[in-house]
């Protein structure tokens, strides 16, 4: 495997917080190649006390299977991908909307 194919985990972030009467978890993982381009990512919002399936993942975006996907409450749909920052912005916006629904 040449250095151009070697991936480096650039971001590995996880935080827990109180949400909707239980502990929620936000997870962000990003892998980059030798040119610092994002080649793999996983964004997940977990509320296991509200949604027990899919390891508690209420919302997520990833490209784990070579396809860009959005996961929501067990449903999976393919999504258009332009660049990682746009996908991350969309994810965090949706997390905010979901949190507001449960906190109102």
Which ranges hold each PLM region?
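The feature represents the first ordered module of a protein
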Residues: 1-69
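Short, compact, well-ordered microdomains
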Residues: 74-104
């Amino acid at each position: 495997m040449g250095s151009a194919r070697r991936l480096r985990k650039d971001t590995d972030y996880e935080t827990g917080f109180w949400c909707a009467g239980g502990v929620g978890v936000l997870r962000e993982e990003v892998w980059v190649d030798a040119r610092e381009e994002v080649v793999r990512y996983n964004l997940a919002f977990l509320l296991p006390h509200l949604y027990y399936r899919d390891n508690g993942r209420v919302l997520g975006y990833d490209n784990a299977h070579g396809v860009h996907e959005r996961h929501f409450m067990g449903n999976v749909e393919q999504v258009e991908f332009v660049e990682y920052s746009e996908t991350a912005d969309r994810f965090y916006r949706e997390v905010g909307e979901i949190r507001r629904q449960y906190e109102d």
